[in-house]
Each structure stands twice: as C-alpha cells, then as structure tokens.
Amino acid sequence: LHYPLRRQRQMCIRDRSNNAKYNAGVTCVIIGLGWNSTKNKYIYADKCKKVNNINYYLLDAPNVIVEHRTSPLSELPIMRKGSQPTDGGFLLMDKEERNEFVLENQKLAPYIRQYMGADDLINGKLRYCLWLKECPEDIMSSCDKLIVRLKNVANIRSNSTKELTRKWALKPHLFTEDRQPDMEYLMLPVVSSEKRQYIPMAYIDSTVIANTNSQMIPDAPIYVFGVLTSLIHSVWMKAVCGRLEMRFAYSASVVYNTFPFPSISDTKKSEIEEAATNVLLARENYPEKTLADLYDPEKMPEDLRAAHEELDAIVESCYPDAPFPNDEARLECLFKLYEKMTANK
C-alpha cells in the first residue's frame, strides 16, 4: 500500500520513533482464533514443527490454564511484595540528598535507609528513603528539610481519590504499606530483561527497605534460592508470567505460587543447598560486577556459568522426566506436574 509513495518520494524504512521521552515501544501479537479443528497444527520457532495441539501458552501441550494463587502450590515459603510509600517521591532521596539531611541533623542518620527495587538490585544503583516508624518526634521536628517533605507527603495523600490513602495523610512519616521483614530476605525483581537465562536475585540485609518493584522471601533457606535461581524455574516464569513490553513481569500469584516443584527429601535439599552456595561463592569472585554484568548471557563468567549448570542438574533431578534435552521438554514435564498437583485442589 505504501510502496508507490515510498518510491515516489525516495523514502526508506527506518526505526520507528515517537514523541515519548524514551521513545515508547510497541509490542504486537497477531493471533487467529477458531472452533476446535482436526486440521494440522504447526508451531514455527527455529523450525516448523507439526503438533497435536497449541495451548494457551503456545505450547504443544494440553489446554491447562495456570490460575492465580494466594499461596504456594509447592512446599515453598511465602513470597510477598515490597513496601509502598505512596509519597509522591518525598520520602525518597539520592545519596547527595541523604548527606544534606544528615549534615543538618546527625540524629536522623539511623532513620535514612537504603531503598531498593528491581533496577537498584540488578544494576547496583544506590537510593535512600526516610524510614521513620521508630523515629522520636523531637528529632523529626528539629529538621526543617524533613518538615517540608512530610507536609508534601500529607498533601499528596490528602488529595488522593482513595479514601484509605487520604487517611494516611495523618501519618505522613510512615509508608502506607509496610511489609519490611526484620530479618535477611531473598529479593527478586518484579521486572527483568527477557534476554537473561536466569532470574537475577540476591540476599538483602533487613536494614535495606524493599519497594514494590521487588518480591521478597524473608529468611529464605539456601535451597529455596537454589530452586528459584535454577533454569527450570526461569523456564516456568517465561511461559506463564506477564510482560512489560517484552520484559518479564514476575508475580508471586502467577509465577511463584503456581510453580510445580516436587516434594523432596532432606538429603536432596542439602544437595541443592551445596550447589546454590557454590553459585553465591562464584559471584563473590566479582565484587565489582553488578547482577546485570554477571547475568549478561554474552559476558557471564565461566565459573558462575559452571556453578549454575551444576545446580540446574541437581534441581532438575527432582523431576520424574529428567534429564531434559531442551526447554520444551522441561515445560512439558512442568505442565504435567502442575495438572497433577492441582487436580484435587
């Protein structure tokens, strides 16, 4: 349709752009729907494959629907989202702003905590927040900068369309949703790149405040880290998770709580724990690198890759059909197990 016009005006095809600040992306999916049919079905990936059925996840598998869950299907600990400030940004600050606050009032230093979400976790960024739940009133009232910020928070909340948020205007020094654990926790990013083989995650000290761009498991055993950082868990996430553009959106209710993992013995847990510890030790060889650096598929250090592959083999040995020749076989096993585990629930 456009070819004659392009030829006439000597136009060429180029990258799409728009007026958005960061050039808003567009993802397009074209799907054909029809009645049940006995016609041949094909999946086109690296090559064309004739299949018996194409399910809702574009796999050659039965039409199983993975449904939201409020608790884990498998024997795994509870995962929860980080805390929500609902503050218009006035409880948050960068390093320079943090130093200015402390310079004005040294007593505020213990109440300014590191603040972390997906981007901070993956790319090693440093941000801070005012964490004032145990801060004495006389300290808060002695800092002019803090008083101004809290007034702005109160104003933001009082103008909210949500009644509950308006009530929180009376307590502008507090986060509206406080889920912060008082022990070390395992943090996973809500949104991460689709290019990585493994989900970047790390253990974080309880003094670091997790925000809602992260998922966390308080006091997570090492073997749980091993299961979640494994290839087979990543394959499950890629199949069932939501998307932001093409990036993965990790949800506890859709990904973690639905993940089918068999019941295993204490001996097997110990094997996973040992292999997972080796992954963490391999990371420690590169203190200058961020998780983004370590899990770049083209730059991943060989010792870290080897540690992950050893862990993958042990985690996958928990499943009945292991070893798996490819991700398709992993998914086939996972969906079968999911169907079995949810049959009576």
Where are these regions (language model features)?
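Basic, amphipathic alpha-helical recognition segments used for DNA target recognition
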Residues: 215-257, 267-278, 282
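Signature of N6-adenine DNA methyltransferases within the class I
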Residues: 1, 7-10, 14-108, 123-127, ...
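Structured core elements
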Residues: 30-32, 115, 129-131, 149, ...
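Non-catalytic DNA-recognition/assembly elements of restriction-modification systems
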Residues: 142-153, 168-169, 258-345
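Segments forming glycine/polar-rich beta-alpha architectures that bind adenosine-containing cofactors
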Residues: 64-212, 327-345
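Conserved structured core elements
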Residues: 25, 48, 106, 110, ...
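Generic beta-strand/beta-sheet core signal
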Residues: 14, 33-34, 188-191, 262-264, ...
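Acidic/polar loop patches that form or flank catalytic/metal-binding clefts of enzymes
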Residues: 39-45, 157-165, 238
